[in-house]
Amino acid sequence: MKEFFLTPQKPAFGEITEKRSKFIAEIRPVCDEKEATAFIEEVRSKHRDARHTVFSYLLIDGKRRYSDDGEPSGTAGAPITEILEKKDFCNCALTVTRYFGGILLGTGGLLRAYSAAATNAIEQCDPVKMTLKSRFSLRCEYTFYNRIPSILSKYGGKILDSDFSNTVSLSVSLPPEHAKTFFDLIFELSGGKILANQLDPLYEKE
């Protein structure tokens, strides 16, 4: 899994004009293909008179898709995907809509124009960094609970959820590189009485 990725904190726009053709880019955070597809259809509906609306989306689960939407192959969808990848963006969808200005741009001109509009939008999106964290469930007696928060904090971790009943149940996260040290320490301190299970990892906002 990726150690981190960037994703837009908010929708953002970019626009350029090249030989009377207008290129309007929009980037938005998305969590899954359903959100990405809905966003793309929303943009196409908004710009129904435009000649082309190309797009790219990348998801942290590995799903990805792009389209040139009728432009020459390799001049639109692939270049904006490459820009997103080089800038470490994920969980986002990016569209670039073209209103044709009557002058052909050629493959090189199209590639430069779509790339410039996409970059313009990306630069306005106020990205947030999402970092991979290990996640665990803990169960312990109350006598051991008071030690856990300070040890977690020492290793860059935090409590995500807690339940206090006959025993204490916690969901915690911490950087993967500190997970073994943390668990070796609490195992030693509790004499093996803190029960731990590894859960699916997650990404947390920096």
Which residues does each PLM region occupy?
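Signal for well-folded cores of large energy- and translation-related assemblies
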Residues: R44, L84-F89, S115, T119-D126, ...
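C-terminal regulatory domains involved in ligand/effector binding and gene-expression control
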Residues: M1-G74, L195, D200-E206
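Active-site beta-strand/loop microenvironment that shapes enzyme catalytic pockets
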Residues: P79-Q124
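Short glycine-/aliphatic-rich beta-strand segments at the starts of folded cytosolic domains
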Residues: D126-Y142, L170-V172
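Short amphipathic alpha-helix segments
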Residues: R139-G157
